[in-house]
């Protein structure tokens, strides 16, 4: 397995697909990186030469990926919560953030149903 950006890339996959195992890199960005670095996207990771791996590493330095990206996203959410805006409060309460209804639906975000004791008649 080649190790790029702190991630073990699967050996038997094409380079184009293997790069998507890195957090922050999808198929479109992987194609862009391969084009810039001049690496053939159709070869397998196990067939890459050391020079090709080094080219990929230098091309990846231009992007925010892995731990830096996770930290950046976490800081953005924390900032919203700290300033007390509606989006931050909704994140804190684990409710939908973008204006969706919650009287029905929103089960994924709200979690499993909690039984509330009803009044007896």
UniProtKB/Swiss-Prot annotation:
Biological process (GO), any one: translation
Keyword Iron-sulfur: no
Comp. bias regions, Basic residues: 100-121
Gene3D superfamilies per record: 1.10.8.50, 30s ribosomal protein s13, domain 2
UniProt KW Ribonucleoprotein keyword: yes
UniProt keyword terms in alphabetical order: Ribonucleoprotein, Ribosomal protein, RNA-binding, rRNA-binding, tRNA-binding
Alphabetized InterPro entries for the sequence: Rbsml_uS13_C, Ribosomal_uS13, Ribosomal_uS13-like_H2TH, Ribosomal_uS13_bac-type, Ribosomal_uS13_CS
Region Disordered: start-end pairs: 97-121
GO cellular component, one term: small ribosomal subunit
Pfam families linked to this entry: Ribosomal_S13
Superkingdom: Bacteria
Signal peptide (from-to): none
GO molecular function: rRNA binding; structural constituent of ribosome; tRNA binding
Stated family: Belongs to the universal ribosomal protein uS13 family.
Function: Located at the top of the head of the 30S subunit, it contacts several helices of the 16S rRNA. In the 70S ribosome it contacts the 23S rRNA (bridge B1a) and protein L5 of the 50S subunit (bridge B1b), connecting the 2 subunits; these bridges are implicated in subunit movement. Contacts the tRNAs in the A and P-sites.
Subunit structure: Part of the 30S ribosomal subunit. Forms a loose heterodimer with protein S19. Forms two bridges to the 50S subunit in the 70S ribosome.
PANTHER family reported in the protein's UniProt record: 30S RIBOSOMAL PROTEIN S13/40S RIBOSOMAL PROTEIN S18 (PTHR10871), SMALL RIBOSOMAL SUBUNIT PROTEIN US13M (PTHR10871:SF1)
Protein's UniProt name: Small ribosomal subunit protein uS13
